[in-house]
């Protein structure tokens, strides 16, 4: 029991070093987690609950990564303009049916 308690305390202290949480008065929580010096993950969570049966939850996650590659070689690429239909009518119709079904399922 004492060994697991020590491990839990060490784990919590290690997480506290890498995650920094800021809570503001409006119920908005900002969390910045740094996994390595090259990768930073930021999350913003907003939760609003009232006496009515309505509640709003927003979660946004952004990841920034630094690219490290081999600069000794290079590859030439060309960009070709696309010519064709932007969206077929059948695809558009099925997409709208899918969106309506999804909204109906959520309500």
From Swiss-Prot:
Coiled coil: none annotated. Residues 85-107 form a propeptide. One of its GO terms (cellular component) is extracellular region. It is a lipid-anchor; GPI-anchor. A lipid is attached at residue 84 (GPI-anchor amidated glycine). Keywords: Cell wall, Glycoprotein, GPI-anchor, Lipoprotein, Membrane, Secreted, Signal. The GPI-anchor is attached to the protein in the endoplasmic reticulum and serves to target the protein to the cell surface. There, the glucosamine-inositol phospholipid moiety is cleaved off and the GPI-modified mannoprotein is covalently attached via its lipidless GPI glycan remnant to the 1,6-beta-glucan of the outer cell wall layer. Residues 1-19 form the signal peptide. It is found in: Secreted, Cell wall; Membrane. Glycans are attached at residue 71. Belongs to the TOS6 family. This is Protein TOS6. The gene is TOS6.
